[in-house]
A protein has these predicted regions:
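Terminal, low-structured helical/coil segments at or just beyond the last alpha-helical repeat
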Residues: 3-5, 214-249
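Structural signature of tandem alpha-helical TPR/SEL1-like repeats
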Residues: 19-29, 57-66, 93-102, 129-138, ...
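Hydrophobic face of amphipathic alpha-helices that form TPR/SEL1-like repeat modules
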Residues: 12-14, 45-52, 79, 83-88, ...
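Short helix-capping/linker turns of helical repeat alpha-solenoids
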Residues: 23, 37-40, 52-54, 59, ...
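Eukaryotic tandem repeat interaction scaffolds
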Residues: 96, 112-193, 199
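Alpha-helical segment of the N-proximal tetratricopeptide repeat
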Residues: 6-37, 41, 45-55
């Protein structure tokens, strides 16, 4: 859907997303106008830039409000983001039960991120009764849609025989797909399998990718695992992970 900007330009939400990199303030103003005119995609995007403070003053409470408005208009990712706000206390008190409701609605409508986030709560019993079987089913649904994080977790369930028969070959395939889709945890999981199979050079390549993309929590955990690795080349990467974690902390 397009809308007028300064009367002479017609922009759509995809163009505005691109403008955010080059002219964030101007883009934010146009997004705000479109959101107020009822453009649902713009309402969801407004929530995102308010959450991040891109081109506009950061306001988590207002971000949540716009996510809710867009969700009421049928925007599934906005529904998912409303759940994220509830789960993490962005602009509101933490309410995992409310987060679970939002995720479930998004998941039931087929959104991969909703399926993933709802599965995370089901797997840990946060905001909802613990149900690892349902969590696994949702991870699988999301993975089959191409959700990289869910691919890695599905692989973990299959490798560890969590509420399902052990299927190592299927696990490795999901790790590979997750790694190739760019998930740093999937890259680390796939590297671990490759290293165990003696394919050290391939494992090192994936470990370097995971190092470049991983967040602080992951790097700290991965550093410990690498430090205990049997292969000296793999073990040597532990220091790079430690240094990267220090730089991010």
């Amino acid at each position: 859907m397009g809308f007028l900007l300064r009367r002479e330009e017609v922009l759509n939400v995809e163009q505005l997303q691109g403008m955010l990199d080059d002219s964030p303030v101007r883009a934010a103003q146009a997004i705000l106008i479109a959101a107020k005119e009822g453009v649902v995609d713009a309402q969801a995007l407004l929530g995102q830039i308010l959450l991040e403070g891109r081109g506009i003053a950061r306001d988590e409470a207002l971000a949540l409000r716009w996510f809710q408005i867009a969700a009421q208009g049928g925007h599934l990712m906005a529904r998912n983001m409303a759940g994220r706000c509830r789960e993490h206390g962005w602009g509101c008190a933490i309410d995992e039960t409310a987060a679970a409701r939002e995720y479930r609605l998004a998941a039931d409508a087929g959104l991969d991120w909703g399926q993933y986030n709802y599965a995370n709560l089901l797997a840990t019993g946060r905001g909802v009764a613990e149900n690892p079987q349902q969590a696994l089913a949702l991870y699988r649904q999301a993975a089959e849609q191409g959700h990289a994080k869910s691919m890695n977790l599905l692989g973990r369930y299959l490798e560890d025989a969590q509420v399902c028969p052990r299927d190592l070959e299927a696990a490795v395939e999901w790790y590979r797909r997750s790694a190739e889709a760019g998930d740093f945890r999937g890259q680390f999981s796939y590297a671990a399998v490759l290293a165990d199979r003696g394919q050290v050079e391939a494992a090192l390549a994936w470990l370097r990718k995971a190092l470049a993309g991983g967040n602080l929590k992951f790097l700290r955990t991965a550093h410990k695992a690498l430090a205990a690795a049997s292969d000296p080349q793999v073990r040597a990467l532990a220091e790079a992970y430690r240094q990267r974690a220090v730089s991010l902390s």
